[in-house]
């Protein structure tokens, strides 16, 4: 967790969303710094005041809430959304994605795109960022951070365990909506851990002995 700060205008910003009606929905906003680290700086969590209980809001109602939080001047470069939102439940009824994006487009915001990765890939992408990059002292520095104002992300993500039947996956019976949104975000921004670069002594091309410095005698 980090204290909120003013995000530089040059950083890339995007959103990631896990849809829910009977259960909560989670829309999270992320910024990408110059080193590729992710900062979750805002959340919109649709819960009914009790753990894992949704609000029953329609996709259009939720879309309007997203637009109230996200301004055009913020220059959010679209977002990733749960694949299931593209499923059509009736012959003529619009999909969740169509309803959400219709509102975003009306407000001149960039719509969502489909998250193309599966749950295992998303879980691994999140795990890699939690481990992060190796430092010179052998420790590791995470590549993802959460503003302290992201209450529900901080409340729910640490409580999620492993699936009883597949330890590669999170427990889907838990309140995993913020977790899923983070997994979509991590999948959309591939991360390659960097090993610490240790300072090396300079060597001559033809000799194994150290080069003599101009300041040594």
Which ranges hold each PLM region?
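ATPase catalytic-site recognition across NTP-hydrolyzing enzymes
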Residues: 1-19
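Short beta-strand scaffold segments in enzyme catalytic cores
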Residues: 25-31
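Accessory terminal regions of nucleic-acid processing enzymes
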Residues: 2-3, 187, 208-212
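Catalytic-loop motifs flanking and including active-site residues across diverse enzymes
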Residues: 23, 96, 177-181
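Short, flexible loop/turn elements at secondary-structure junctions
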Residues: 19-21, 83
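Acidic, Mg2+-coordinating catalytic module of metal-dependent nucleases/exonucleases
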Residues: 169-198
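Mg2+-dependent endonuclease catalytic cores in nucleic-acid-processing enzymes, primarily RNase H-like
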Residues: 34-171, 190-193, 204-205, 213-217
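Residue-level detector of short, conserved catalytic/binding motifs and their immediate flanks
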Residues: 13, 25, 77, 179
């Amino acid at each position: 967790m980090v204290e909120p700060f003013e995000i530089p205008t040059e950083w890339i910003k995007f959103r990631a969303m896990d849809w829910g009606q009977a259960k909560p929905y989670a829309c999270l906003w992320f910024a990408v710094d110059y080193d590729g680290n992710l900062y979750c700086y805002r959340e919109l969590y649709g819960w009914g005041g009790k753990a894992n209980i949704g609000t029953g809001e329609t996709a259009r109602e939720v879309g309007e809430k997203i637009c109230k939080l996200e301004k055009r001047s913020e220059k959010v470069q679209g977002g990733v959304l749960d694949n299931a939102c593209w499923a059509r439940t009736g012959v003529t009824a619009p999909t969740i994605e169509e309803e959400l994006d219709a509102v975003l487009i009306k407000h001149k915001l960039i719509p969502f795109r489909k998250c193309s990765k599966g749950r295992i890939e998303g879980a691994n992408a999140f795990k890699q960022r939690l481990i992060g990059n190796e430092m010179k002292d052998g420790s590791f520095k995470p590549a993802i951070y959460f503003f302290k104002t992201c209450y529900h992300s901080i409340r729910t993500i640490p409580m999620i365990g492993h699936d009883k039947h597949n330890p590669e996956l999170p427990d889907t019976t838990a309140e995993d909506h913020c977790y899923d949104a983070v997994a979509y975000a991590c999948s959309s921004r591939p991360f390659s851990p960097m090993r610490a670069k240790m300072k090396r002594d300079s060597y001559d091309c033809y000799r194994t002995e150290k080069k003599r410095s101009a300041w040594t005698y």
